Amino acid sequence: MSFDSVPRHALSMRFDLEPPSHASAAHRVAVLLVNLGTPDAPTPRAVRRYLAQFLSDPRVVEIPQLVWQVILRTLILPLRGRASAKKYAAVWLPEGSPLRVYTERQVESVKPLFAANGYRVIVDYAMRYGTPSIADVLAQLKRAGAERVLLLPMYPQYSSSTTATAFDAAFAALGRMRNQPEVRTVRHYADHPAYIHALAEQVRQYWAAHGRPAFDAGDKLVLSFHGVPKRTLDLGDPYHDQCQQTAALLMSALGLTTFECRVTFQSRFGKAEWLQPYTAPTLKELGAAGVRRADVFCPGFTADCLETIEEIGIEVRDEFVHGGGKEFHRIPCLNASPAWIAALGEIAAENLQGWPVRVAMAPEAVS
């Protein structure tokens, strides 16, 4: 074959260094939970570094990069870095960032569940932005003998700006590997019965401990999903429809109607129109309309983070109270609740079918 027929980029391609392949090596299966990411510390420098990576993703901000990078580097990072660091510091746990802490707990909780059901798999997690990166963890899994990897995003509803970009990062890492593992992806589980059950259980258990809203007296449950620009809906992103689907199934599981329950979208960034109604203005309007109690739950967030603890628990609460509301409740996210861990195991097991993950005898503890 003549090199003239080989694409120029292929001639200059460089692959990551890898150890020699051995036929006798362990052929293991891995489940990789993928979440968004978090700064390494609640400091302006760490937050700016994280935001620079996050907001430089063209799937997150769909503006020509040459223009956007000037805006990002000269205006947004200098201003938002310090302000965001203060917010992170307010929610930081002794063990670290809430998102990382709860994600690690999910991993440690699902491992024994797999083992108890006869699965011998490696379970780990990675972050799309920050550490541990998807590329680094995939490399670690390969060194541990993983030849098959299930990518399980912690985003129940698919969106280009979350699920797709996580897959982009994974495939980019694979593109640098000479010896690639087999990979499967979980696109979404917005309507999965186990996920809906876990959501309903989380709400029920919170109400059992803190009292159920007096819906007959006008109290409300607000289901707040992370927002995205409205134009993404017009361009074919299924996120909005899947959020509505999740909300409808959860309301049905709780026996609620659209009178008792509202669906909203939070975390708007910039001046463009995002999916509506917006969470904070809705809570302010409810308070002004005489709603005494409002409970807010975030079904699209599988682990508590800045957007749920600080934005909902502080900023949105203040909007409701200033509007005239009396009692505000933020229902914690799924985190490592037993029902959610069981759901994670079920969703993963369905997508592991056909791979050699079961053992005939009592399994060893998973790595």
Swiss-Prot record:
User: Where is this gene product found?
Assistant: Cytoplasm
Q: Can the keyword Endoplasmic reticulum be found in this entry's annotation? A: no
Q: Does the keyword ATP-binding apply?
A: no
Which Gene Ontology molecular-function terms are recorded?
A: ferrochelatase activity; metal ion binding
Q: SUPFAM superfamilies under this entry?
A: Chelatase
Q: Where does Fe cation bind?
A: H226, E307
Q: Which domain of life is it from?
A: Bacteria
Q: Name one Pfam family in it.
A: Ferrochelatase
Concerning Gene3D superfamilies, the annotation shows:
3.40.50.1400
Q: Which UniProt keywords apply?
A: Cytoplasm, Heme biosynthesis, Iron, Lyase, Metal-binding, Porphyrin biosynthesis
The GO biological-process annotations, alphabetized, read as: heme biosynthetic process
Name the reaction it catalyses: heme b + 2 H(+) = protoporphyrin IX + Fe(2+)
Q: Which biological pathway?
A: Porphyrin-containing compound metabolism; protoheme biosynthesis; protoheme from protoporphyrin-IX: step 1/1
The EC number(s) given in the record are 4.98.1.1
Q: What class of enzyme is it?
A: lyase
Q: What family does this chain come from, according to its entry?
A: Belongs to the ferrochelatase family.
What does this protein's UniProt record list under function?
A: Catalyzes the ferrous insertion into protoporphyrin IX.
Q: What is this protein called?
A: Ferrochelatase
Organism listed in the record: Burkholderia pseudomallei (strain K96243)
